[in-house]
């Protein structure tokens, strides 16, 4: 089965919501994402919780402009480890507990630590991330919700078919509609709201799904990301491993991969719990989650090493460092172009023509202007690569697989360092847990009135803009203006690689 359509929310009221209102004292807010202990939590690569990335170009809608279209492509929220990673974590903990004859004071907690994390599913932390994401999406794009009693005015939702992705879409929708209801305060006579459905697209190995890779055999068999990481681990992890073996235990000798598993526990053990819970401590006066004790075993420089390792894996496995990565994102880009231009999807790669040719499962109407899609980090990397977002990354200088470039460890999240980001790739800026990419169309005029597009002829005035985790990215190949935007027709032309199907023929050569 390629498709399921499930009901979302036909009626939402505060009494029907689960956990789901943001705590003003929490580390995680709809506006800025996760901000506590940022020197550590923002250096976990793709395992970082979402945080708003400072932007050199203002993410606000420019004065004199009015939005005409908004689409979000979102990663699922924070999850438990995958089965393979969970097994590796459990193995190293067992190794330590069964062999260690002495623990240094900072390591003694391991003796009594019971590994009880789940596998693969969304955590409570991840649920709240997605609720916050839905709230923020409504607050940013409320102007496009012309009439909340009209189904076509509300977001059209699609999710790739894994449980955590579906749950993320549901929690996002809860946040969106709770914000809408709080804003509009509709009279009882207007309730229930129009019934909404979510399109769920199968992730089976033979399913065409633009939000889940799996069909391109040559890409699936590639090992470029693993190879880059293996080289980097061999060059950079031995000093960390030697320190832990010398100072942390007696009677046990950890390998570099054992140490990597212990480092993985820092983010996974932290995001296993809600942002505000019994873990709140006096050391965090503003409230929020205490870092896992496993984080204290490592230095800030250790986490720079860890963060760079994750960036290498994504860049060379699922991004520009893999020659077939962009091709995995071509189908989604062609769907995006169809929505932006209100025209049929033209694609022969990963799109499902049955779904994309049906108005119920892929609506193409000038009245439909708000969309939300939910996917995974690896798939988003391919899509962003196909969108030419990473063309400014200097791979030779910034993505060396043995040495961390100076700029990588010095830029951080400080807005004062924005200029130093040019040519730099950090995966935590791109696809953290609950990552979101906003695609916007807007029309602008000289007098600031921001009149709506009135006719097809006026479409040539529409501009396209892309924001990645609140950071405006300057578009490539389409004569972008100083605000990073391109005219719609120029943007479409710049997607020539996607429009011709990428290198799909090489998938089966």
Swiss-Prot record:
It comes from the Eukaryota. Optimum temperature is 60 degrees Celsius. It is an enzyme of class 3 (hydrolase). It is found in: Secreted. Disulfide bonds join 27-36, 65-444, 216-507, 266-295, 478-486. Residues 1-15 form the signal peptide. The active site is at 76 (nucleophile). 1D-myo-inositol hexakisphosphate binds at residues 46-47, 75-76, 79, 82, 164, 314, 376-377. PROSITE patterns: HIS_ACID_PHOSPHAT_1, HIS_ACID_PHOSPHAT_2. This is Phytase A. It comes from Neurospora crassa (strain ATCC 24698 / 74-OR23-1A / CBS 708.71 / DSM 1257 / FGSC 987). The gene is pht-1.
């Amino acid at each position: 089965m390629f498709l399921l359509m499930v009901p979302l929310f036909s009626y939402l009221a505060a009494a029907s919501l689960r956990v789901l209102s943001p705590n003003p004292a929490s580390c995680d807010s709809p506006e800025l994402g996760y901000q506590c202990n940022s020197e550590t939590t923002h250096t976990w690569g793709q395992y970082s919780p979402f945080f708003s990335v400072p932007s050199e170009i203002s993410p606000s809608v420019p004065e004199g402009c009015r939005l005409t279209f908004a689409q979000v492509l979102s990663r699922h929220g924070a999850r438990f480890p995958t089965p393979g990673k969970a097994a590796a974590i459990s193995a190293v903990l067992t190794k330590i507990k069964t062999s260690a004859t002495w623990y240094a004071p900072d390591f003694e907690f391991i003796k009594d630590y019971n590994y009880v994390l789940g596998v693969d599913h969304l955590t409570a932390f991840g649920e709240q991330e997605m609720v916050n994401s839905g709230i923020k999406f409504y607050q940013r794009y409320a102007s496009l919700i012309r009439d909340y009693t009209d189904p076509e005015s509300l977001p059209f939702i699609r999710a790739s078919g894994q449980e955590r992705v579906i749950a993320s879409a549901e929690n996002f929708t809860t946040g969106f509609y709770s914000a809408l209801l709080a804003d509009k305060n509709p009279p009882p006579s207007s309730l229930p709201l129009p019934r909404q459905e979510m399109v769920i697209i199968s992730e089976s190995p033979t399913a065409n799904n633009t939000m889940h890779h799996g069909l391109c055999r040559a890409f699936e068999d590639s090992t470029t990301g693993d190879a880059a990481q293996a080289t980097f681990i061999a060059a950079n992890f031995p000093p960390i491993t030697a320190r832990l073996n010398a100072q942390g235990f007696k009677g046990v000798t950890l390998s570099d991969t054992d140490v990597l598993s212990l480092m993985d526990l820092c983010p996974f053990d932290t995001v296993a719990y809600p942002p505000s819970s019994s873990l709140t401590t006096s050391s965090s006066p503003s409230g929020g989650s205490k870092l896992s004790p496993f984080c204290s075993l490592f230095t800030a420089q250790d986490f720079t090493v860890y963060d760079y390792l994750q960036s290498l894996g994504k860049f060379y496995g699922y991004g520009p460092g893999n020659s077939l990565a962009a091709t995995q994102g071509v189908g989604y880009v062609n769907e995006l172009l169809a929505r932006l231009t209100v025209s049929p999807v033209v694609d022969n790669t990963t799109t499902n023509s049955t779904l994309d040719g049906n108005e119920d499962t892929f609506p193409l109407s000038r009245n439909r202007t708000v969309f939300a899609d939910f996917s995974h980090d690896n798939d988003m990397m391919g899509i962003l690569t196909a969108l030419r977002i990473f063309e400014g990354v200097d791979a030779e200088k910034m993505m060396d697989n043995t040495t961390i470039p100076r700029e990588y460890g010095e830029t951080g999240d400080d807005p004062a360092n924005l200029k130093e980001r040019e040519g730099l790739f950090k995966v935590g800026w791109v696809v953290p847990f609950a990552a979101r990419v906003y695609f916007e169309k807007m029309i602008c005029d000289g007098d600031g009135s921001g009149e709506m597009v009135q006719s097809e002829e006026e479409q040539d005035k529409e501009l396209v803009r892309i924001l990645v985790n609140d950071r405006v990215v300057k578009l490539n190949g389409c004569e972008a203006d100083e605000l990073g935007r391109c005219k719609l027709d120029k943007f479409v032309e710049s997607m020539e690689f996607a429009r011709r199907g990428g290198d799909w023929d090489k998938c089966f050569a």
